[in-house]
Amino acid sequence: MLAAPVMFIEGLVAYLILPVQNLTQPEDIVDFFNSNASLIGLVGLFGTVLSISFLGGLYVSYDLKDKGENIDPLNALSIGFKKFFPFLGAYFICSIAIFFSAFLLILPAFYVAGRLALFPPLMMLENKGVMDSLRLSWDKTDEHGGILFGLTLAFFLITFLVASLLQLILEPGIGQIAVLAVLEYVVVIPWGYVYFSLYKSLKNQ
């Protein structure tokens, strides 16, 4: 339920830009975006806010589940939203680090992604700042870099291969968009829990 609003908005964005697939001329593509830029931009901005709030709220939900407690999905999103700007900042810096590491080779990008993957629980559950959460994530995962690299690469490959297969099987349209949106979060939620479990394990040492 926590992911439902995010899946809906992301699906809506994909649906709004779906007609681009049928356009072959550059000027037609430019005209399409000129005509729909405001709507796509507004929905996309709302989707970004929801996505960041979801990621923050997800780790709060993990923590409460681990303690045998429950939280209303809207409350979890609300808690995530309160950390929107620092979470967005950390996510942006993390993305830049992964992007530049990909210039070396593709594989180092997965290593960096795995090493920085503990910043969400550090930020949401320990109230760490942007740079502190990234630094602590890197420091705490020093002995687990190889495992995190393997897990991050495996989750990415599973998602990529299944998504590619579904795109081949399903006709482009709202059905394909809906299935791919569900697939994304079927992978993201257990993927995030793996990182949360490592965070809890390191914290209890």
Each language-model region and where it sits:
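Hydrophobic alpha-helical membrane segments
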Residues: 1-205
